[in-house]
């Protein structure tokens, strides 16, 4: 995907788009193990921002991403260089970027989930909604 974006896809100005190959290489084994052996449906992941090519490739292998979007990596209508809930179509759980918010978002989401479960917040709210008024 990164090779295609930098070398095969036509570029009017000849500039390369980058792609952070080392970041992708460093997380490939972990993400492969997670997505194909460990994660359950309810699990959520914040992908290391510079490893989005690995995330998008895995989503393609799972049938959640198109080849055309992979070929258009980092271009209009293609997959994003940082996973984005609003711009990517392949099930990004948390938008991440270069400022490291992914780690904080997953931590706080986990804390909120634990709090609501321990305090039965959701069940209490549903009970109040369903009570005859």
Placement of each model-derived feature along the sequence:
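Cofactor-binding active-site loop characterized by glycine-rich and histidine/acidic residues
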Residues: 3-10, 20-133
């Amino acid at each position: 995907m990164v090779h295609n974006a930098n070398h095969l896809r036509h570029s009017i100005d000849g500039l390369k788009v980058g792609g952070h190959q080392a970041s992708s290489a460093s997380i490939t084994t972990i993400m492969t193990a997670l997505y194909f052996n460990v994660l359950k449906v309810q699990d959520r992941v914040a992908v290391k921002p510079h490893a989005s090519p690995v995330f998008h490739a895995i989503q393609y292998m799972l049938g959640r991403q198109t080849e055309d979007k992979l070929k258009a990596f980092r271009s209009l209508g293609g997959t994003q260089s940082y996973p984005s809930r609003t711009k990517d179509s392949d099930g990004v759980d948390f938008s991440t970027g270069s400022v490291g918010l992914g780690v904080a978002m997953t931590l706080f989401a986990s804390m909120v989930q634990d709090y609501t479960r321990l305090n039965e917040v959701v069940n209490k709210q549903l009970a109040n909604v369903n009570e005859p008024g």
